[in-house]
Amino acid sequence: MPQRGPTSVYLDEFRVGFNPRPDPLERALKAAQMSVDLDPTGHLSQHALAQVHFYRGDLEAFFPAAQKGVQLNPNDSTIVAMTGLLTAYAGEWESGLGMLEKAMALDPYHPGWYYFPLAFEHYRNGNYERALEEARKVNMPGYYPTHMTLAAIYGQLGRTKEALVSIENLLQLFPGYGTRAWEELEKWFTKPDMVEHVVEGLRKAGLEIPEDRRDDVAGPRSGVG
């Protein structure tokens, strides 16, 4: 039986802190590789393996695995979109956003998380008003990155009132996020300058974030991945 299910469970231990146990990424890697071995032409198995490589920071393995997953089923809009998101966050913004554009064309009624990379593309280039336009399209109030993204943008724009509301919403979903900000952002953005840029926006928004990258203990929080 393909091991995509266990792979997702193990990844969520790492991504969102559900039932955390030791070495979630190593367990995810073994399960994902077994899934690919059992189902070598399955795009979901290949995509699961690509995700594991991404979160392990092995971009050399991530890119070919991600490309293969899309090639095996180029019409699965969710897989194309998630691959685009991870590709963009891995630093290949043009390629990643191209995949997001294709995914949106495949599914005109796509979920709001498709807009995160578009918002951060404008954010990283200092186009904060455009970033805000895209971030507002996410419309996922129960997902903590929605409020984290808005807070960073509002912070950069100097819109104090909206920034504080976003911080309050963020902390309701993820108490203590400030002490975990470095760690959480580094799970997604592979480039240190991007992580620092987002931290800068969050600090301007009023969130207290330590100078060092502390690995404090936190429980599960509300969200997806």
Go through the PLM ranges and name each one:
Residues R4, V9-D12:
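Carboxylate/His-rich catalytic cores and anion/metal-binding grooves
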Residues L11-D12, P22, A28-V36, G42-F54, ...:
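Alpha-helical protein-protein interaction modules
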